[in-house]
From Swiss-Prot:
InterPro entries: Helicase_ATP-bd (IPR014001), Helicase_C-like (IPR001650), P-loop_NTPase (IPR027417), SEC_C_motif (IPR004027), SecA (IPR000185), SecA_CS (IPR020937), SecA_DEAD (IPR011115), SecA_motor_DEAD (IPR014018)
Positions of ATP binding: Q87, G105, E106, G107, K108, T109, D513
Protein name in UniProt: Protein translocase subunit SecA
Source species: Vibrio vulnificus (strain CMCP6)
SUPFAM superfamilies with a match to the protein in the record: Helical scaffold and wing domains of SecA, P-loop containing nucleoside triphosphate hydrolases, Pre-protein crosslinking domain of SecA
Region (Disordered), start-end ranges: 841-907
Free-text function comment from the UniProt entry: Part of the Sec protein translocase complex. Interacts with the SecYEG preprotein conducting channel. Has a central role in coupling the hydrolysis of ATP to the transfer of proteins into and across the cell membrane, serving both as a receptor for the preprotein-SecB complex and as an ATP-driven molecular motor driving the stepwise translocation of polypeptide chains across the membrane.
Length: 907
């Protein structure tokens, strides 16, 4: 009560922020007459002046009013567009490292030019992050004339760019690119072997467009760079054939109830579990099909991988639906459909073998599983920036998450013109068929009066169902979903025309405004060299149509189902009523919708259905509250999942930082011989301790074992026994010293043969590649630890604490193994001449660079993450060109040794 009273008197935090920023807006506006009087050359010279003032000690905040006034004036001259005051406020919010919630159509692209220009003056580069390549290219090309007028360079960062072009793009003052590509470049840079192979510079300032999509919807999905693992495609096919034999059980087994089904489904958490009966039945099938020995169990250590395959196949059949969660394209590939946007995501693959299981289910070619080489979550990548900001039309519902995870405050920016869209209450029907019939009637009525309609659906399947119903009703319409997204811009351009009907999956088309009356720019662009007279004529025609649409009520939004997140619903509504235009929206629901079916209480459902007749709809405040409560519940659960992922990933992130800092150190110095020398002493002391325990009696020493170990692992001939026989006064410490000195002399002899510089390069190469190999294995070990750690809860242990403790032990082991492996490899490399070492070093580098080139940059799918809450992924294969040499096979070089004891040490 007191809080509400105080808010009324002094305003909310948002109101106070806006009041403070409006004072700076006045200051910017005061510069306008002065800047209007400047010539183009004088205006352009402002950039040089600002940079000089920064060097002299002024701050970016002190330059802000003049810099924003400069951009506004340049925009008037280049585009004939003047930034509104609310856009200046949005620009200041972004510059302060906050999130600006700006409604659709309020000009976010133009707003971003203000903080981008100001922060680019610092010379450290500004990254403007978008959700897809199309928007990155569009926004970069749209704003390029403005930035170049002011003397700034603009770059574009998209996949598959040649290395020199990408490196040059990162040197630009302002760089547009996708969230995936920025993250992958960071990972690739940390797999490079030379500084000149890196592309990124420091991460200074990022403006994230559609920040809710990138930092929240995709926060559970790690970016992964992966290479090929072993082939197990035949096993997927064989297990896939068994799954249709399993029967679903409606209720979980308990003390009172034991069903005869084989699996149960938990729709809320998107999980499927084998029952006890199911486990026994699957084991019988496995034995029959020769996949398991008689009397064996799925849960024995030797069969863990079989259990993994069964679970993946079961989830593929039960939880993942064609044309909802994925499509099969013309090339016979399973392509994931993004649950948030309805777009296809080529190149992304589900984790934990799920993608291969879906491929087996669909009978298409099964790609190999891949092994993670490097990974990072968006949460941890974007927290690397010195200053981070974002903009979106819908952030306020997630303000708490932005604040608690990223430390970003959300500021709601007022619209330039008052919002007059009419958001009508939800209507609820008993069945989906009744709901669709009502939607068709509503569309018919709107089309008759010339009002454009946008219908939002939750999946491709639903959009096609509705499309078929509209065809039967002879209503002309366009469908915008993952299957047709190459026509997206064209369909969106038509969506605002009188009487046009557009069905869009989720928020496909996001980032492109629906202009009432259609897009006159699209018509101009379709003409070859139009004259000014023709352009004016097109504009005049468009104005008439635009006014006609406004009179009919503006764009009408129909939602066919409530989403799990209120934010996605708000995004759909936000397509209408842009810049003070007329518009309306309504959601049509049925008791068969997944949100209502899963989250509405049985009592509420029975109460609603008992009093309803066929075709009858209800509008009820109680029901609306119940739906909102269900959405809040789901949002809370999803927030907890993301928070938990971050807590686990933070452990890996600390280790990632240590490994990447070590890599940076290795790459920035030419000579690591001191480090190698220090490691050699450490490793040899440890080996000697095993055979000559410190401060022990001579009778306890295993001198023969020590001699053999030194010879086998380090190629050192140290006749320790003979030394003792020759000098019985040789005490333990002196003996240790003698062994280490022998190792040093042997290594120095190698150095004299090949030359110091060549050996220095070889040491660095061995160290980097050994570190990369061990880090890759460590990631796999961390992944396995993460998957089973929740079971510690049954032993009354805290899974997170256990994960931290065990991952720390694993990491300590990695650092120790790194030392010993590098010392062993360098000790055992036998070289006769300089050319041999140079050839081997070149061979190692070529292999590593080839592996890096062929490694796949992947983004594990959000749907899989929700389903299994795992942390890593398996992805598209990289096909090996020749047969892999087994570790115990003879080495192909002809030395007569086993591969693992010869070139296997190098590779």
């Amino acid at each position: 009560m007191i809080t509400k009273l105080l808010t009324k008197v002094i305003g909310s935090r948002n109101d106070r922020t806006l009041r403070r920023l409006r004072k700076i807006v006045k200051e910017i506006n005061n510069y306008e007459p002065t800047f209007e009087a400047l010539s183009d050359e004088q205006l352009k010279a402002k950039t040089v002046e600002f940079r000089q003032r920064l060097e002299q000690g002024e701050t970016l905040d002190q330059l802000l009013p003049e810099a924003f006034a400069t951009v506004r004036e340049a925009s008037k001259r280049v585009y004939g567009m003047r930034h509104f005051d609310v856009q200046l406020i949005g620009g200041m919010v972004l510059n302060a490292g906050q999130i600006a919630e700006m409604r659709t159509g309020e000009g976010k692209t133009l707003t971003a030019t203000l903080p981008a220009y100001l922060n680019a003056l610092a010379g450290k580069g500004v990254h403007i992050v978008t959700v897809n390549d199309y928007l990155a290219k569009r926004d970069a090309e749209t704003n390029r004339p403005l930035f170049e007028f002011l003397g700034m360079t603009v770059g574009i960062n998209v996949p598959n760019m040649p290395h020199p072009a990408k490196k040059e793009a990162y040197q630009a003052d302002i760089l547009y690119g996708t969230n995936n590509e920025f993250g992958f470049d960071y990972l690739r840079d940390n797999m490079a072997f030379r500084n000149e192979d890196r592309v990124q510079r420091e991460r200074f300032f990022a403006v994230v467009d559609e920040v809710d999509s990138i930092l929240i919807d995709e926060a559970r999905t790690p970016l992964i760079i992966s290479g090929p693992a072993e082939d197990s495609s035949e096993l997927y096919t064989r297990i896939n054939a068994l799954i249709p034999l399993l029967q679903k059980q409606d209720k979980e087994d308990s003390e009172e109830y034991r069903g005869d089904g084989h699996y149960t489904v938990d729709e809320k958490s998107k999980q499927v579990h084998l029952t006890e009966t199911g486990q026994e039945f699957v084991e019988e099938l496995m034995v029959k099909n020769g996949l398991m020995e008689e009397g064996d169990t799925l849960y024995s250590p030797t069969n863990i991988s079989l259990l993994h395959h069964v679970n993946a196949a079961l989830r593929a059949h039960v939880l993942f639906e064609k044309n909802v969660d994925y499509i099969v394209n013309e090339d016979g590939e399973v392509v994931i459909v993004d649950e948030h946007t309805g777009r296809t995501m080529p190149g992304r693959r589900w984790s934990e073998g799920l993608h291969q299981a879906v491929e087996a289910k669909e009978g298409v070619k099964i790609q190999n599983e891949n092994q993670t080489l490097a990974s990072i979550t968006f949460q941890n990548y974007f927290r690397l920036y010195e200053k981070l900001s974002g903009m979106t039309g819908t952030a306020d519902t997630e303000a708490f998450e932005f604040q608690s995870i990223y430390g970003l405050e959300t500021v709601v920016i007022p619209t330039n013109k008052p919002m007059i869209r009419n958001d009508m209450p939800d209507v609820v029907y008993r069945t989906e068929a009744e709901k669709f019939a009502a939607i068709i009637e509503d569309i018919k009525a709107r089309v008759e009066k010339g009002q454009p309609v946008l219908v939002g659906t939750v999946s491709i399947e639903k959009s096609e169902l509705l499309s078929n119903a509209l065809k039967k009703a002879k209503i002309k319409h366009n469908v915008l979903n993952a299957k047709f997204h190459e026509k997206e811009a064209e369909i969106v351009a038509e969506a605002g025309k009188p009487g046009s009907v557009t069905i869009a999956t989720n928020m496909a088309g996001r980032g492109t405004d629906i202009v009432l009356g259609g897009s006159w720019q699209a018509k101009v662009e379709s003409m070859a060299n139009p004259t000014q007279e023709q352009i004016d004529e097109i504009k005049a025609e468009w104005k008439l149509v635009h006014d006609q649409v406004l009179e009919s009520g503006g764009l009408h939004i129909i939602g066919t189902e409530r989403h799990e997140s209120r934010r996605i619903d708000n995004q759909l509504r936000g397509r209408s009523g842009r810049q003070g235009d007329a518009g309306s929206s309504r959601f049509y629901l049925s008791m068969e919708d997944s949100l209502l079916r899963i989250f509405t209480s049985d009592r509420m459902a029975a109460l609603i259905q008992s009093g309803m007749e066929e075709g009858e709809a209800i509008e009820s405040k109680m029901l609306s509250r119940s739906i909102e409560k269900a959405q809040r519940k789901v949002e809370g659960r999803n927030f907890d999942i993301r928070k938990q992922l971050l807590e686990y990933d933070d452990v890996a992130n600390d280790q990632r930082k240590v490994v990447y800092e070590l890599r940076d150190e290795l790459m920035s110095v030419d000579d690591i011989s001191d480090m190698i020398e220090h490691n050699r002493v450490d490793v040899l002391q440890g080996v000697i301790d095993e055979y000559i325990p410190p401060q022990s009696l001579e009778d306890m020493w295993d001198l023969e074992g020590l001699q053999e170990r030194l010879k086998n692992d380090f190629d050192i001939d140290a006749p320790v026994k003979q030394w003792l026989e020759e000098d019985d006064k040789l005490y333990e410490e002196a003996l240790r010293e003698k062994v280490i000195n022998t190792a040093v002399e042997v290594y120095k002899a190698k150095e004299e043969v090949v030359g110091a510089q060549v050996l220095r390069n070889f040491e660095k190469s061995v160290m980097l590649q050994t570190l990369d190999t061990l880090w890759k294995e460590h990631l796999a070990a961390m992944d396995h630890l993460r998957q089973g750690i929740h079971l510690r809860g049954y032993a009354q242990k805290n899974p997170k604490q256990e994960y931290k403790r065990e991952s720390f032990e694993l990491f300590e082991g990695l650092l120790e193994t790194l030392k010993s492996d590098v010392v062993m490899i360098l000790s055992k490399v036998r070289v006769q001449q300089q050319e041999e070492v140079e050839r081997m070093e070149a061979q190692r580098r070529a292999q590593a660079e080839e592996a890096a080139r062929r490694a796949q940059a992947q983004h594990a799918s959000a749907q899989s993450q929700l389903a299994d809450d795992s942390d890593e992924g398996h992805h598209q294969p990289v096909v090996r060109d020749e047969r892999k040499v087994g570790r115990n096979e003879p080495c192909p070089c002809g030395s007569g040794k086993k591969y693992k004891q010869c070139h296997g040490q190098i590779n």
